[in-house]
A protein has these predicted regions:
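Conserved beta-strand-loop-alpha-helix junction that forms the acyl-donor binding cleft
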Residues: 121, 147-157, 169, 174
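Acyl-donor-binding surface of acyltransferase catalytic domains
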Residues: 1-45
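Conserved acetyl-CoA-binding loop-helix of GNAT-fold acetyltransferases
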Residues: 116, 122-137, 158-163
Length: 174
């Protein structure tokens, strides 16, 4: 399942939004970064749509994530309860700090959503969390790991993806 991103204007500079599609084709391409001490990565073993919704709303509010804002409970449940989806949560000092969703299809794994709660941005967690997401994606027997980001996301999002080893394979306006 792929979610269509709607056209938006970049409120930071009033330019049309740009979307970058990035990929990694081999696990060895990962330039990993360790998570700092006092962090724990937890897989959501029991589908909990409200948890995914919470992270989507709280992480996405700073970056104008809108594609799921109008989802019904049934849409959330249908998304989260699929075998192809894994949700992972980052705990920092025992407190939820971020998450990522891995969506597997056709031998590829998409990092569908990834991010930190606002309180935890700037604490050195992003590179380690992204590295963990990529490692978990490769662990799903992926032949390719991919992600997309846009000019509305965190100003360092694209740099983080590239620093971890992702390569841009397509750039387009939204």
């Amino acid at each position: 399942m792929h979610i269509q991103v709607r056209y938006r204007m970049n409120v930071r500079n009033s330019e049309p939004e740009t979307i970058w599609h990035l990929e990694m084709l081999h696990p060895e391409e990962l330039c990993g970064r360790a998570l700092p001490p006092k962090t724990q990565l937890v897989k959501q073993e029991i589908p909990l749509p409200d948890l995914n919704r919470f992270f989507y709303l709280e992480v996405g509010k700073l970056w104008q994530w809108t594609d799921r804002l109008l989802w019904t409970e049934e849409q959330w449940r249908n998304w989260v309860e699929r075998e192809a989806l894994q949700t992972w949560m980052l705990l920092f000092h025992g407190t939820p700090a971020g998450y990522f969703e891995l969506n597997s299809f056709d031998g590829a794994v998409e990092i569908a959503y990834f991010g930190l709660l606002p309180l935890f941005i700037g604490k050195g967690l992003g590179g380690g969390l992204l590295s963990a997401a990529v490692e978990k994606a490769w662990g799903m027997n992926a032949k390719r790991v991919w992600v997309h980001t846009c000019s509305l996301d965190h100003p360092y999002a694209l740099k983080n993806y590239q620093a971890r080893g992702f390569q841009i394979y397509r750039e387009s306006p939204a």
